[in-house]
Design a protein with these regions (language model features):
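Phosphate/ribose-recognition catalytic cores of enzymes acting on nucleotide-derived substrates
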Residues: 15-130
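Contiguous mid-protein beta-loop-alpha structural module that forms a pocket-lining wall or clamp
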Residues: 1-2
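Short, structured loop/turn "capping" segments at alpha-beta junctions
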Residues: 6-11
């Protein structure tokens, strides 16, 4: 479902466990204030905003069930076609549309195939949205 406005969470990019990087999908791990009311966990198409620029991103909000389940919700964004370091930067993460629920994958290969599909879906959604 489309929200009437873009839901946005802001925070500082911190070092995560670099698992995304290890499989070719580096993500910005955003540490956000605990008082945010969060949307449901899952994968979203959206944007990461900093320096007054908006970058297309595949966003994952959730518990990282494939690698090691976390109780708190982690917020990670894979910025499309982007390779700068953002550690320590204050960024906004804007959610445009829900793509799918979070799920546990039984292999890295399956996870990678799904992430590639998620990126295609993200591009398609954001293209329609602009």
């Amino acid at each position: 479902a489309m929200l009437g406005y873009r839901f946005r969470i802001s925070g500082i990019v911190v070092h995560g466990r670099h698992q995304g990087h290890a499989i070719g999908f580096p993500t910005a791990n955003v540490q956000y204030d605990s008082e945010y009311l969060l949307p449901k966990s899952g994968v979203y198409a959206g944007y990461v905003v900093f320096d007054n620029k908006r970058y297309e991103a595949m966003i994952n909000l959730g518990h990282n069930p494939t690698f090691n389940y976390r109780n708190d919700m982690s917020l990670e964004a894979h910025i499309l076609d982007f390779n700068q370091e953002l550690y320590g930067r204050y960024v906004g993460v804007e959610f445009v549309r829900f793509i799918r629920d979070e799920k546990r994958f039984n292999s890295k290969g399956n996870l990678i195939m799904q992430l590639e599909q998620d990126i295609l879906n993200t591009k398609k959604i954001l293209k329609e949205y602009e």
